[in-house]
Structures are given as structure tokens and as C-alpha cells.
Amino acid sequence: MKSHIQSLLEQTIESFKQQGILPADFEARIQVDRTKDKSHGDLATNVAMMLTKAAGKNPRELAQLIIDNLPASAYVAKVEIAGPGFINFFIDDSALANQLQAAIGDEHLGIKLPAPQTVVVDYSSPNLAKEMHVGHLRSTIIGDSVVRTLEFLGHKVIRQNHVGDWGTQFGMLLAYMEELRAANGEQAQLELSDLETFYRAAKLRFDESAEFATRARQLVVALQSGDEYCNKLWREFNDISLSHCHEVYERLGVSLTRADVHGESAYNADLEQVVNDLAAKGLLTESNGAKVVFQEEFRTKEGEPLPVIIQKADGGYLYATTDLAAMRYRSNVLKADRVLYFVDLRQALHFQQVFSLAKLAKFVREDMSLEHLGFGTMNGEDGRPFKTRTGGVVKLVDLLDEANTRALELVRSKNPDMDEATLAEIARVVGISAVKYADLSKNRTSDYIFSFEQMLSFEGNTAPYLLYAYTRVAGIFKRATDVDLSQAKIVLEHEKEKDLGNKLAQFGEILSRVVDKGQPHVLCGYLYELAGAFSSFYEACPVLAADNDEQKHSRLLLSQLTASTLQKGLNLLGIETLERM
């Protein structure tokens, strides 16, 4: 509905250009917002006030002119001017009912799909040297929610798990694995549970033994040169590490697969060409033996030029080099329209520099959008980055285990007579959902406090509340098994029916915001408001005990669409629903 009103206004402004009321080359920014006070209509715009200078008219006069020239629309019951020149639109109840009717049974819930784009989404991307920890959670689940929503809206999505599977640390790891094999024979295996121990032991040997450090550096050179023995060990290590990652993904309900892994090593053969091309374009400068690029717009606080280091003095490459190669691949091979990077906000400057350089060097098409969708940190209740009691990094599997244990206690306390298998399944869903939703419901760019107590509450904007809200709506149909709704029609008469209908009609607008800005918290807030709107409707408008069959069937259809929207919305967040709690 919002986009429909925007279209009416765009048509009107275009006619003003043709009539000479506005300059022919005038670019208008039209904003339509939902009103908070329904006495002021359903939607409002301040476009008349924005155009007053260009049109040479006072805002109220221009507002009336806009109203007089609006194309006819069955969706609009009336239009009024308010205050200094706001234009308020009142939506026709029967038109809204028809829109909701069309959404029932439609796989996209009546949402008009945008023109499809090819969108590359770079998310999760852990280093393969260690087990996944809580620091990987935000990129993984925020990215996955946006991916799911993009696909639901008809876009072609290419997932890219840009894992850290290359670099100098792998020489250290290979050297230590080599020592273990020498001591324990070819049967020695690195167990998943030993990843952290293995890394720490290798680092300790590297720091304490000059001989070991020399061997590690030799193995890096051999690995980069394509040595078969080193590559075999490297692949084995990566396989073990990736297996761990994908166990975590499966447990989290994340859609990443092995086929989506396209790590740093995938661009090894392209790095020399990146350097050569930058040199050929006259962009490279030598600084202390390193090859760097200076861009005028990037300077330190003291005004000194801030370089992008492309190649170190010893010939090694850096993240910037790999990122430039990846951008070129995503532009020229994957043909992306947008590339979204879900990476910590602390990398903002890095991405600003490499995005700018990629465009400057013409490594990417001018029309390809490069977007760093950064995020804040997960903090403990002391406001500091989330750690174990001993100050260590919290492993993601340990966090999920704790969530499951707490959820099981919670569900058992509410269902003391439930069988263990059902308890375990409900606890699994509630525990994982609580962790994911607590993160997704926060503004992506904000830090947030991690609290098991808050996230497992059945009150407020939490996963348990929404999961219960869904089971409550779906439960109506367990008591209405003999009702035929095939010929039923939605009729909006009661104010709470209209409120629920208006909220249901906003689903498409909300999803557009999720994919345009990479902000799943907007969807979380919407689902919470939808659950509240249904609760108010259910209290005020008897469903199964309605006054007559027509009213009963209409309210059942509203309930059905609410259940479908809640379920789809939670699914887009990567959250399973339950039929009972």
C-alpha cells in the first residue's frame, strides 16, 4: 500500500513537470510514512513542503494541487491536508480486505516482487585455524537472515563464505602437524575438540623455538609454491576445520554449505595480477620497500596520507590484495549487482579504502554496489566483550550447549508431564531460537548485552514469546477442523480487525527494508508488533464464537494469514516454529 501511494505521487509530480509547474529536470524525493494517529489517516507525506520552493507556491496550496491531480485509486478512501501542508491518505477498508484476501494461499503472501538482482553475500567467514567462537555469531546469522529474505523476494543470491584458509599462520600449523606425524605416525589425527589446543601448542612452539619458526616459514613458502606434501597437509587441516564449522552451521540452522566456501586461497593465482594491474595504471607507490596505494581522500588525523598496503617488502600479500581480487571476481565472473559484506564495524576504514580503490582501478563495474554492512559487538553483562569466567574466548558450541540446557529446564518447568523426546525437541528449538533472536532483534550497528535470562523470557520481544504467539494462532485451527474457508471472504468491520489487517499489509515494506539496509531487527520488531496486534484482535473479536458464519470465517482467514506471516517471518530469520510448547 505504501508503494502504491508513492507511485500515485510520482505520477502526479511527473504531470507537474509536463505542465511546467515543476522544472523538467527536477528530481523529487518522495517519502511516505505510516501515521501514528489513525485520525490523521493511514499514510502521510510531506512532499508538498519539499516541493514548495521549486514550484514557487506555499505548501498548503501545493498540497491541494497535488490532491486535485492524483490519479484515481480504489485503495484510497479520502485524502486530507493537515497542518502546514502534510497530505494524509485514508485507505479504503474493502480495498485493504481484497489485498489481504489475495495474500492468502500465495507463496509470497501477496508481496509484489521487485526486479531481480544478482546479490553476492559475504558472511560468516571464520579463520580455519580455530574453532568458531561467539565473535562469529553475528556475521553468520545476520548474513543468513538477509540471504533468506533476498531469496524470498526473488533475487539470485550467491553465498560466499570467505574463510581464512591461507596466510603465514598456516606454516606454523603445518610445522606442528608435521611434528605430531613424526612422533605418532601417519595415523595421528587432529580431533575437532583439539583445534584450540592444537593452535595454542603450535603458537607456543613458534614463539619458543627459532628452529621451529624457521621451519614454519619454509613451509609457508613451500605451500605458496604448490608443494604437494604441504598442500596435502593443508587440505587435511582445512577439511577438519570446515567439518567443525558446518556442524555449527547445521546446529544454528544456517543455510551455508561446503559449496559456498570460497576462501582466501581461491584468489592466490590472482594476486600477482592485482599488483601488476595497479602498477600499470600508475597507482602503486613504493614505501619502505612495500608496494602501496595512496588515495587523496584517506588521511590520518594529522593529515598524513593513509596507504593501502598491497604487497609487503618481503613479497607477501595482505587482506587488501585478496579483497581486491575477490571484488574483481565477483564483478566480472559472478556478475553481481550488489556485494554485501557482513563484517565487524571495526573494519569500516579497510572497506572504505578497498571499495574506493576497486572503483578507481576499474576492477569492478561502475554500477556494482559494494556495501559493508558492519555490526557491533556482543558484550557480557559487565558491558565488555563476552568472555568465559577465566577471560577466555567463548566457543560457539559451548554457548549453544548452555542455551539448550537452560531452555530444557525452562520447558520442563512449564510442562512437567511432557515426555523426554518432545521436551528435548522443543528445548532445542527454543534454545537456538533464543540465541539467534536476541542478536537479530538488536540494531545491527549497535553493541548489545548478552543475557540468557532476558532471551529466554516469555515476555517482551523474544523468541519464546513469538514462538508461543505462533502456536497460539495456529492452535485455533486445531479447534476448527470442520470449517470450510474455500469461499470465505475477509470483511474488516471492527477497529481491531482493521488494525490487524493494516499490520499484515506492511509485511512487504518491512522485507524491503531488511534487504535494502541489511537490518533483520526491523523484521523482528514487526513480528513482535504483529503478535501484539493479533492478541488485541483476539481479545476484542471472538473468532470461533463470532456472531455469524460470515464473521467467523473472515476472522479465521485473518488468523490464518497472521499464522502464515509469523511463520514466514520467523523462517526468514532462520528460526523454526513449533506446533506446541
UniProtKB/Swiss-Prot annotation:
Highest rank taxon of the organism: Bacteria
GO terms of biological process kind: arginyl-tRNA aminoacylation
GO CC annotation, single: cytoplasm
Name this protein carries in UniProt: Arginine--tRNA ligase
Entry's Gene Ontology molecular function annotations: arginine-tRNA ligase activity; ATP binding
E.C. code: 6.1.1.19
Main localization category: cytoplasm
Keywords assigned by UniProt, alphabetized: Aminoacyl-tRNA synthetase, ATP-binding, Cytoplasm, Ligase, Nucleotide-binding, Protein biosynthesis
InterPro entries: aa-tRNA-synth_I_CS, Arg-tRNA-ligase, Arg-tRNA-synth_N, Arg-tRNA-synth_N_sf, ArgRS_core, DALR_anticod-bd, Rossmann-like_a/b/a_fold, tRNAsynth_Ia_anticodon-bd
Motif ('HIGH' region): 126-136
Location within or outside the cell: Cytoplasm
Signal peptide: none
Family: Belongs to the class-I aminoacyl-tRNA synthetase family.
Native organism: Shewanella oneidensis (strain ATCC 700550 / JCM 31522 / CIP 106686 / LMG 19005 / NCIMB 14063 / MR-1)
Complex formation: Monomer.
Gene giving rise to this polypeptide: argS
Catalytic activity: tRNA(Arg) + L-arginine + ATP = L-arginyl-tRNA(Arg) + AMP + diphosphate
